[in-house]
Protein backbone atom coordinates (compact mmCIF):
# COMPACT_ATOMS: atom_id res chain seq x y z
CA UNK A 1 0.00 0.00 0.00
CA UNK A 2 1.37 3.39 -1.02
CA UNK A 3 -0.48 6.66 -0.44
CA UNK A 4 0.08 8.84 -3.48
CA UNK A 5 -2.37 11.62 -2.71
CA UNK A 6 -1.65 12.22 0.95
CA UNK A 7 1.79 12.84 2.45
CA UNK A 8 1.81 15.60 5.06
CA UNK A 9 5.57 15.46 5.49
CA UNK A 10 6.25 15.89 1.77
CA UNK A 11 3.68 18.68 1.47
CA UNK A 12 5.26 20.61 4.34
CA UNK A 13 8.83 20.02 3.17
CA UNK A 14 8.10 20.76 -0.50
CA UNK A 15 5.26 23.27 -0.95
CA UNK A 16 6.30 23.48 -4.61
CA UNK A 17 5.03 19.90 -5.00
CA UNK A 18 1.49 20.81 -3.89
CA UNK A 19 -1.57 21.06 -6.11
CA UNK A 20 -2.52 24.74 -6.57
CA UNK A 21 -5.78 26.39 -7.54
CA UNK A 22 -6.13 29.21 -10.06
CA UNK A 23 -5.19 31.78 -7.41
CA UNK A 24 -2.08 29.88 -6.37
CA UNK A 25 -3.45 28.57 -3.08
CA UNK A 26 -2.71 25.00 -2.03
CA UNK A 27 -5.64 22.64 -2.67
CA UNK A 28 -6.72 20.71 0.43
CA UNK A 29 -9.24 17.98 1.15
CA UNK A 30 -11.18 20.25 3.52
CA UNK A 31 -11.01 23.80 4.85
CA UNK A 32 -8.56 24.32 7.71
CA UNK A 33 -7.00 27.80 7.71
CA UNK A 34 -3.29 28.15 8.39
CA UNK A 35 -4.10 30.68 11.15
CA UNK A 36 -6.76 28.50 12.83
CA UNK A 37 -6.88 28.66 16.62
CA UNK A 38 -6.55 25.61 18.84
CA UNK A 39 -10.24 25.65 19.80
CA UNK A 40 -11.61 26.27 16.29
CA UNK A 41 -13.80 23.44 14.93
CA UNK A 42 -11.68 20.99 12.96
CA UNK A 43 -12.68 18.98 9.88
CA UNK A 44 -12.84 15.20 10.25
CA UNK A 45 -9.62 15.00 8.24
CA UNK A 46 -7.59 17.35 6.09
CA UNK A 47 -4.52 17.15 3.92
CA UNK A 48 -2.73 18.98 1.13
CA UNK A 49 -2.85 17.36 -2.30
CA UNK A 50 0.39 16.72 -4.19
CA UNK A 51 1.02 17.02 -7.93
CA UNK A 52 2.49 14.25 -10.10
CA UNK A 53 3.91 16.87 -12.48
CA UNK A 54 6.54 18.01 -9.95
CA UNK A 55 9.51 16.54 -8.13
CA UNK A 56 6.98 14.51 -6.16
CA UNK A 57 6.79 12.11 -9.12
CA UNK A 58 10.56 11.53 -8.99
CA UNK A 59 10.35 11.08 -5.21
CA UNK A 60 7.69 8.38 -5.63
CA UNK A 61 9.69 6.63 -8.35
CA UNK A 62 12.72 6.49 -6.05
CA UNK A 63 10.73 5.08 -3.13
CA UNK A 64 8.92 2.49 -5.24
CA UNK A 65 12.19 1.37 -6.80
CA UNK A 66 13.63 0.97 -3.30
CA UNK A 67 10.66 -1.24 -2.38
CA UNK A 68 11.13 -3.31 -5.54
CA UNK A 69 14.84 -3.77 -4.88
CA UNK A 70 14.66 -4.55 -1.16
CA UNK A 71 11.86 -7.12 -1.27
CA UNK A 72 12.49 -10.23 -3.38
CA UNK A 73 8.78 -11.07 -3.47
CA UNK A 74 6.36 -8.26 -4.34
CA UNK A 75 3.00 -9.67 -5.40
CA UNK A 76 1.43 -6.27 -5.93
CA UNK A 77 1.43 -2.54 -5.26
CA UNK A 78 -1.72 -0.62 -4.42
CA UNK A 79 -1.51 3.16 -4.88
CA UNK A 80 -4.13 5.33 -3.20
CA UNK A 81 -5.89 8.66 -3.80
CA UNK A 82 -5.72 9.59 -7.49
CA UNK A 83 -8.11 12.50 -8.08
CA UNK A 84 -7.79 14.05 -11.52
CA UNK A 85 -10.90 16.17 -10.97
CA UNK A 86 -8.91 18.39 -8.58
CA UNK A 87 -7.38 20.61 -11.24
CA UNK A 88 -3.82 21.79 -10.70
CA UNK A 89 -2.36 25.17 -11.66
CA UNK A 90 1.06 24.81 -10.04
CA UNK A 91 4.04 26.31 -11.87
CA UNK A 92 4.88 23.03 -13.61
CA UNK A 93 1.31 22.38 -14.78
CA UNK A 94 0.76 25.98 -15.87
CA UNK A 95 3.99 25.95 -17.87
CA UNK A 96 3.18 22.65 -19.61
CA UNK A 97 -0.40 23.68 -20.36
CA UNK A 98 0.92 26.83 -22.04
CA UNK A 99 3.42 24.78 -24.04
CA UNK A 100 0.67 22.39 -25.18
CA UNK A 101 -1.77 25.19 -25.98
CA UNK A 102 -4.31 24.10 -23.36
CA UNK A 103 -6.97 26.75 -22.72
CA UNK A 104 -6.72 27.20 -18.94
CA UNK A 105 -10.24 28.69 -18.89
CA UNK A 106 -11.69 25.51 -20.40
CA UNK A 107 -12.53 23.19 -17.49
CA UNK A 108 -12.81 20.14 -19.74
CA UNK A 109 -9.45 20.83 -21.39
CA UNK A 110 -7.75 21.34 -18.02
CA UNK A 111 -9.32 18.11 -16.79
CA UNK A 112 -8.01 16.22 -19.81
CA UNK A 113 -4.56 17.67 -19.13
CA UNK A 114 -4.72 16.50 -15.51
CA UNK A 115 -5.59 13.00 -16.70
CA UNK A 116 -2.65 13.18 -19.12
CA UNK A 117 -0.27 14.03 -16.24
CA UNK A 118 -1.63 11.18 -14.11
CA UNK A 119 -1.48 8.76 -17.05
CA UNK A 120 2.17 9.56 -17.71
CA UNK A 121 2.99 9.13 -14.02
CA UNK A 122 1.12 5.82 -13.75
CA UNK A 123 2.67 4.37 -16.89
CA UNK A 124 6.14 5.23 -15.57
CA UNK A 125 5.35 3.40 -12.33
CA UNK A 126 3.99 0.38 -14.20
CA UNK A 127 7.15 0.19 -16.30
CA UNK A 128 9.40 0.54 -13.25
CA UNK A 129 7.60 -2.17 -11.28
CA UNK A 130 7.58 -4.58 -14.22
CA UNK A 131 11.37 -4.34 -14.49
CA UNK A 132 11.72 -5.93 -11.04
CA UNK A 133 8.46 -7.83 -10.53
CA UNK A 134 6.77 -8.48 -13.89
CA UNK A 135 4.02 -10.63 -12.33
CA UNK A 136 3.05 -8.07 -9.67
CA UNK A 137 -0.45 -6.63 -9.82
CA UNK A 138 -0.74 -2.84 -9.83
CA UNK A 139 -3.77 -0.74 -8.93
CA UNK A 140 -4.30 3.03 -8.78
CA UNK A 141 -7.23 3.83 -6.51
CA UNK A 142 -9.64 6.49 -7.71
CA UNK A 143 -9.45 5.41 -11.34
CA UNK A 144 -12.53 3.17 -11.06
CA UNK A 145 -14.77 5.76 -9.36
CA UNK A 146 -17.83 6.66 -11.41
CA UNK A 147 -18.72 9.69 -9.28
CA UNK A 148 -16.52 12.74 -9.97
CA UNK A 149 -15.96 10.72 -13.09
CA UNK A 150 -13.02 12.41 -14.87
CA UNK A 151 -10.77 9.39 -14.30
CA UNK A 152 -13.58 7.08 -15.41
CA UNK A 153 -14.50 9.01 -18.56
CA UNK A 154 -10.88 9.03 -19.69
CA UNK A 155 -10.50 5.32 -18.84
CA UNK A 156 -7.64 5.88 -16.42
CA UNK A 157 -8.39 2.40 -15.05
CA UNK A 158 -6.63 0.95 -18.11
CA UNK A 159 -3.35 1.43 -16.21
CA UNK A 160 -4.50 -1.12 -13.61
CA UNK A 161 -3.87 -4.86 -13.86
CA UNK A 162 -7.08 -5.56 -11.89
CA UNK A 163 -9.97 -3.43 -10.73
CA UNK A 164 -10.86 -2.63 -7.11
CA UNK A 165 -14.14 -0.79 -6.60
CA UNK A 166 -14.02 1.42 -3.52
CA UNK A 167 -17.52 1.56 -2.10
CA UNK A 168 -18.70 3.08 1.17
CA UNK A 169 -22.38 3.28 0.19
CA UNK A 170 -23.47 5.22 3.28
CA UNK A 171 -21.29 8.17 2.27
CA UNK A 172 -20.38 7.81 -1.45
CA UNK A 173 -23.08 7.32 -4.01
CA UNK A 174 -25.54 5.15 -2.11
CA UNK A 175 -26.45 1.52 -2.76
CA UNK A 176 -27.41 1.92 -6.42
CA UNK A 177 -23.90 2.63 -7.69
CA UNK A 178 -22.33 -0.82 -7.32
CA UNK A 179 -24.52 -2.70 -9.85
CA UNK A 180 -23.62 -0.30 -12.66
CA UNK A 181 -19.96 -0.07 -11.69
CA UNK A 182 -19.42 -3.80 -11.29
CA UNK A 183 -21.21 -4.72 -14.52
CA UNK A 184 -19.14 -2.21 -16.48
CA UNK A 185 -15.87 -3.83 -15.44
CA UNK A 186 -17.11 -7.42 -15.55
CA UNK A 187 -18.46 -6.96 -19.07
CA UNK A 188 -15.07 -5.53 -20.07
CA UNK A 189 -13.42 -8.73 -18.83
CA UNK A 190 -11.80 -7.48 -15.63
CA UNK A 191 -11.66 -9.38 -12.33
CA UNK A 192 -13.11 -7.11 -9.65
CA UNK A 193 -12.93 -6.75 -5.88
CA UNK A 194 -15.27 -4.42 -3.99
CA UNK A 195 -13.91 -2.63 -0.93
CA UNK A 196 -16.08 -1.47 1.95
CA UNK A 197 -15.68 -1.13 5.69
CA UNK A 198 -17.41 -0.66 9.02
CA UNK A 199 -17.20 3.11 8.56
CA UNK A 200 -20.26 5.26 7.89
CA UNK A 201 -18.68 8.53 6.74
CA UNK A 202 -15.03 8.00 5.75
CA UNK A 203 -12.14 5.57 5.98
CA UNK A 204 -10.77 5.69 9.52
CA UNK A 205 -13.89 7.33 11.00
CA UNK A 206 -14.18 6.11 14.56
CA UNK A 207 -17.67 7.42 15.30
CA UNK A 208 -19.47 4.12 15.09
CA UNK A 209 -19.93 0.72 13.51
CA UNK A 210 -22.34 -0.34 10.81
CA UNK A 211 -24.98 -2.75 11.97
CA UNK A 212 -24.02 -6.38 11.17
CA UNK A 213 -27.10 -6.63 8.95
CA UNK A 214 -25.80 -3.77 6.82
CA UNK A 215 -22.41 -5.44 6.44
CA UNK A 216 -24.05 -8.75 5.48
CA UNK A 217 -26.17 -6.93 2.90
CA UNK A 218 -23.08 -5.28 1.41
CA UNK A 219 -21.25 -8.63 1.25
CA UNK A 220 -24.25 -10.31 -0.39
CA UNK A 221 -24.46 -7.48 -2.94
CA UNK A 222 -20.77 -7.82 -3.79
CA UNK A 223 -21.12 -11.56 -4.37
CA UNK A 224 -24.38 -11.13 -6.30
CA UNK A 225 -22.70 -8.67 -8.65
CA UNK A 226 -19.75 -10.99 -9.30
CA UNK A 227 -17.10 -9.38 -7.11
CA UNK A 228 -14.63 -10.54 -4.51
CA UNK A 229 -15.30 -9.09 -1.03
CA UNK A 230 -12.86 -6.87 0.83
CA UNK A 231 -13.81 -5.37 4.20
Residue ranges and their predicted role:
Residues 17-42, 85-100, 145-179:
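Repeat-unit-sized solenoid/scaffold elements
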Residues 7-9, 83-85, 201:
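Short secondary-structure capping/turn micro-motifs that flank functional sites
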Residues 22-25, 98-101, 186-187, 214-218:
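Short, surface-exposed linear patches
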Residues 1-5, 80-81, 142, 196:
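Glycine-rich, histidine-containing beta strand-loop boundary motifs that form or position
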Residues 52-159:
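Active-site neighborhood of glycoside hydrolase catalytic domains
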Residues 10-12, 107-108, 119-231:
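Hydrophobic targeting/anchoring helices
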Residues 5-71, 104-111, 115, 123:
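Active-site-adjacent "subsite" loops/lids of carbohydrate-active enzymes
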Amino acid sequence: YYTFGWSCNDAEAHPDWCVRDRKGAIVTSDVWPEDAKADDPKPSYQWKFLCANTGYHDHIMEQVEEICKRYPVVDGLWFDIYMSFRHCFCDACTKEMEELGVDKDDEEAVGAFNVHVMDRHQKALRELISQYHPAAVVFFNGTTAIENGLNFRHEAYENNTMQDLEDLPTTWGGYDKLPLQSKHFLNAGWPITVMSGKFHKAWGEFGGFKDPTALKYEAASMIAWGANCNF
